[in-house]
């Protein structure tokens, strides 16, 4: 099962890809008020499972990878793509 996104991860992901709350709302088809409300809390975002899935898909589609808390803390990063792979 995929761990829920935290508000800190959501804010950090938007910052990495330089999206506004409106950009994320449009990409995820989730209301901008829902995006803003989700980002002001600490911890897991208080949205429906369907909205969280839509937000995750939009951010992952923009190249974001979510990092679970594995002792080093949760976070986000750019997903490794073909362009970043070392050439042989």
Where on the chain are the PLM-derived regions?
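A detector for short, charged/polar N-terminal pre-domain segments
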Residues: 1-5
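Residue-level recognition of specific faces of alpha-helices
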Residues: 9, 34-37, 58, 75
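Short basic helix-loop element that most often maps to the first helix and adjoining turn
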Residues: 10-23, 85-86
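Residues in the recognition helix of alpha-helical DNA-binding motifs
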Residues: 13, 27, 38
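Recognition helix of helix-turn-helix/homeodomain-like DNA-binding domains
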Residues: 30-47
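DNA major-groove recognition helix of helix-turn-helix/homeodomain DNA-binding modules
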Residues: 49-66
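Helix-turn-helix/homeodomain-like alpha-helical modules used for DNA recognition
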Residues: 64-88
């Amino acid at each position: 099962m995929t761990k829920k996104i935290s508000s800190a991860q959501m804010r950090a992901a938007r910052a990495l890809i330089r999206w506004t709350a409106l950009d994320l709302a449009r990409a995820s088809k989730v209301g901008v008020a829902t995006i803003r409300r989700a980002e002001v809390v600490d911890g897991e975002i208080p949205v429906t499972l369907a909205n969280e899935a839509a937000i995750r898909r939009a951010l992952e589609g923009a190249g974001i990878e979510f990092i679970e808390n594995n002792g080093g803390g949760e976070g986000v990063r750019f997903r490794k793509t073909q362009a970043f792979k070392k050439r042989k």
